[in-house]
Swiss-Prot record:
Localization annotation: Cytoplasm
Keywords assigned: Cytoplasm, Decarboxylase, Lyase, Porphyrin biosynthesis
Entry GO CC: cytosol
Gene3D superfamilies assigned: 3.20.20.210
Lineage of producing organism: Bacteria, Pseudomonadati, Pseudomonadota, Gammaproteobacteria, Vibrionales
Classification via SUPFAM superfamilies: UROD/MetE-like (SSF51726)
Name under which the protein is recorded: Uroporphyrinogen decarboxylase
The organism of origin for this protein: Photobacterium profundum (strain SS9)
Subunit comment: Homodimer.
Amino acid sequence: MSELKNDRYLRALLKQPVDCTPVWMMRQAGRYLPEYRATRSVAGDFMSLCKNAELASEVTLQPLRRFPLDAAILFSDILTIPDAMGLGLYFEAGEGPKFERPITCKADVDKIGLPDPEGELQYVMNAVRQIRKDLQGEVPLIGFSGSPWTLATYMVEGGSSKAFTKIKKMMYAEPATLHLLLDKLADSVVEYLNAQIKAGAQSVMVFDTWGGVLTPSDYNEFSLRYMHKIVDGLIRENDGHRVPVTLFTKNGGMWLEQIAATGCDAIGLDWTINIADANRRVGDKVALQGNMDPSILYAQPERIRQEVATILEGYGDEGTGHVFNLGHGIHLDVPPENAGVFVDAVHELSKPYHK
């Protein structure tokens, strides 16, 4: 991977030797950075920022100017696919994303088509191309999508939810309708991620934020089955290089063996699982990403370093196969200097594990 100045992240995902543990942060481009807030105010609103390739690239690169991160992640949103399907995405102040036309029945599912990644979603591909150009080979670029199940929760609920009653009603009363929707979404995600890879994404990640609200059997049937379909459909080699894929189910620690069996390269872990246990269970099959509680970034520097040391020790001295990250996105009111302490601690404290 000679064109990359720093390929630590990709090497760790492929379990190749690295000099120290690579690190990046979910939501590393975001509201905790004053420069992000300034750029967003220029764009006007969140989706305008996503749809402007130059500004999306600017906010993607902002955290890399502050911190020696080992990867950049595309600045976008998981709801781009349902938005492109015509559901009318909008953001209510203080309430998060909502849809004007949620999915309520089979007729609604029949109506939606698969968006063209270089048509309705071309703005995402333009952002990928712009970011790759602006990165100048410094670090790899991660592309991403929401999982079919997680996208479906927003589409059926009409926005965020705490109890997920609407989608669970569909799941138990009209399972065939939900499977039809999930199948369409899986096909869309495959096309979308493959287009990101062709546009320049060097690794991809599927975020299954709400898989953890399901029973074990429902998780297999309504979430994992469709992520497996995505893994099977992805371009796994591009431009002469392997394109690693990471699956992340929040609150999915009980299902690591099943997730590893999809053929993914890595599993993202949240903070509710001990990384030593995870490594014992599936470390021979996949790399692991995670898994510090993002709230620890509110602590004093020494406490942050202590937590980093604990997680590194838990993963052990295999020398590779671990990408350090938070267990979910960084909180918007974390002091940026604390994020810097975290990133520096990972690089410094992991070196003895990579001799």
